[in-house]
C-alpha cells in the first residue's frame, strides 16, 4: 500500500519523479506533486487517488484518467522539462537534477520537504530532501508526480509525431516514445538521427559515426543508456 507521507507531521511535502530519462529521443520531464495532509481530500467524484501507482504499471488510459485527477485534486503541482540539447550538454543525471529544481521553482506553496524517486538528490534551498530508491512504488506523491511527467512527455512526443509523421514511420516513436526498442535502433541505422535525438547517448553516437565514451568502448552493455523496452 502506498504511503501518504514520508513522516507523520504537518510539513508541506512534495513528491518528484521523472519520465524519459532513459530515452534516446527528446525531452526529459519531471513532475512535482503536493497533496493535502488530510486523508479525506483524496476523494474526487467518487474516485480515490489511492488508485495512483507507479506510472509504468498503469495503462495509457488509466494514466490519462489519473493525470486529470491529480491536476484537479493536488494542493499544488508542476511539470518541468529539459530539452535533448540540455541533456547532452549537462549529461542525463545533471539534467534530471536541474529539472527537479525547475519543477520546484514552479510551485506556489512553500514546501518544507522533498521526496524523490531514485538515489540522487541535489539540495534545494534549505528544504529537507530525501532520495528514495523505488520511491514511486512506495509514496503516493512520487507516483503521482511520475504520472504527470509520463503523460506530459507522451503528449509532447505525440505532438512531434503529428508534426513529423516520418519519425513514427522510421523510428516507431508513436509506440516506443523514444526508448531504444529494436524498431527505434533499426531506424537509427537506416535513417540516421533527427534534431531531437540525444547525441550524448551511445546508440545515437554510433548512428552519427561519433566516438563512444570509454565506458561504452569497454563493452559494458549497461552503459548503453536508453536501450530498453518502452512502457
Q: What is each PLM-predicted segment?
A:
Residues 1-231:
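RNase H-like, Mg2+-dependent phosphodiesterase core
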Amino acid at each position: 500500500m502506498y504511503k501518504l507521507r514520508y513522516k507523520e507531521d504537518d510539513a508541506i511535502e512534495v513528491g518528484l519523479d521523472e519520465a524519459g530519462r532513459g530515452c534516446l529521443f527528446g525531452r526529459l520531464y519531471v513532475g512535482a506533486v503536493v497533496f493535502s495532509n488530510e486523508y479525506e481530500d483524496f476523494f474526487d467524484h467518487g474516485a480515490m487517488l489511492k488508485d495512483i501507482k507507479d506510472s509504468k504499471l498503469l495503462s495509457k488510459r488509466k494514466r490519462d484518467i489519473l493525470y486529470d485527477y491529480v491536476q484537479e485534486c493536488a494542493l499544488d503541482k508542476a511539470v518541468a522539462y529539459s530539452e535533448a540539447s540540455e541533456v547532452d550538454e549537462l549529461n542525463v543525471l545533471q539534467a534530471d537534477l536541474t529539472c527537479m529544481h525547475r519543477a520546484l521553482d514552479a510551485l506556489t506553496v512553500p514546501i518544507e520537504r522533498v521526496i524523490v524517486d531514485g538515489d540522487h538528490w541535489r539540495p534545494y534551498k534549505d528544504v529537507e530532501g530525501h532520495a528514495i530508491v523505488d520511491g514511486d512504488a512506495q509514496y503516493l506523491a512520487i507516483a503521482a508526480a511520475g504520472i504527470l511527467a509520463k503523460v506530459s512527455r507522451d503528449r509532447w512526443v505525440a505532438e512531434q509525431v503529428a508534426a513529423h509523421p516520418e519519425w513514427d514511420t522510421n523510428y516507431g516513436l508513436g509506440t516506443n516514445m523514444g526508448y531504444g526498442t529494436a524498431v527505434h535502433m533499426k531506424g537509427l541505422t537506416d535513417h540516421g538521427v533527427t534534431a531531437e535525438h540525444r547525441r550524448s547517448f551511445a546508440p545515437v553516437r554510433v548512428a552519427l559515426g561519433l566516438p563512444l565514451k570509454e565506458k561504452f568502448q569497454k563493452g559494458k552493455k549497461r552503459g548503453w543508456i536508453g536501450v530498453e523496452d518502452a512502457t
